[in-house]
Amino acid sequence: MNKKYTAEELDLLHAELYDILGETIRVCQKHNIPYFVIGGTAIGALYDQAVLPWDDDIDIGMTRENYNKFLKVAPEELGPSYFLSWIETDPHTPYYFAKVKKNDTLFVEEMFKNVPMHPGIFVDIFPFDKIPDNKLLRRIQSEALGFLKCCLMGKEIWMWKHFGTCEICLLYTSPSPRDGLLS
């Protein structure tokens, strides 16, 4: 969560998030793309059957194969009120994953307020690569990837500050010959 919201602001934000999620699910179901909720979204679904009252986003995950399929079909399948934001469609995005954003809405994260990218309210879509079956190995992989994420996000912010570009994202939005390094 980036800031404090009033209850009314959160209600409006949650309504938009559910709308975006519904459209994302529609596309996934039409194309037989399995997905799963993650992070705070999973906790909210488990305990409240809803978005956590204080949460300002929804996170879903897909295997890399399904993520790539989603990236291929979503630009044509999403309704006109939605936009698939990732490095191919929103070249200034500093993110290494995709977002389904709602047009004609505004949600700008403070650290990216000067980045010329689509400003809409969004649902995050994360690719999952080479997930180990072993619980300990999954934990190690998760910690390593969390560290890598922090390094990348810091690098991206620095790059925007100094160069106004984020070419490093290309390394992490498509399959890599290094896939499986941690498994």
In which residue ranges do the predicted regions lie?
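Helical scaffold of the NTase/Pol beta-like nucleotidyltransferase catalytic core
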Residues: 1-38
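Metal-dependent nucleotidyltransferase catalytic core
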Residues: 17-20, 61-101
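Internal, conserved structured core segments that host functional sites
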Residues: 86-146
